[in-house]
Amino acid sequence: MTNTERVLAYIDAWNRMDWAAVEEALADDVIYHNIPMQKIEGKAAAMGFITGMQPEGVDWQVIAIAENSDGVVLTERVDNFDMPGGKKLSLPVMGTFEFTDGRISAWRDYFDLATFTNQMA
């Protein structure tokens, strides 16, 4: 399986809200960084953040995906969430995924924080 295929499977797990599969894809020492926010280190902390969002629906749409010769995968996405209380969040994102032994060891998502906070208000 290529790292591109791993990322697509990871996104599919998010879309199914299969949190066990999301967790399985992460390295124990993963670094997860939503660039406008604080960096999160470790699988337990990453999963705490992820499940703490409590979405009622997830639909990440991949616009473009590419893998370089080092196996780093870059995604251009629109991450859509149905949030509690009927709120809808649609966030354009550029994401970078790095791998160690087939698991995501670094994940950085770049997005506009104002777009996020305005939709969550």
What are the language-model segments listed below?
Residues 1-121:
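C-terminal and inter-domain tail/linker signature
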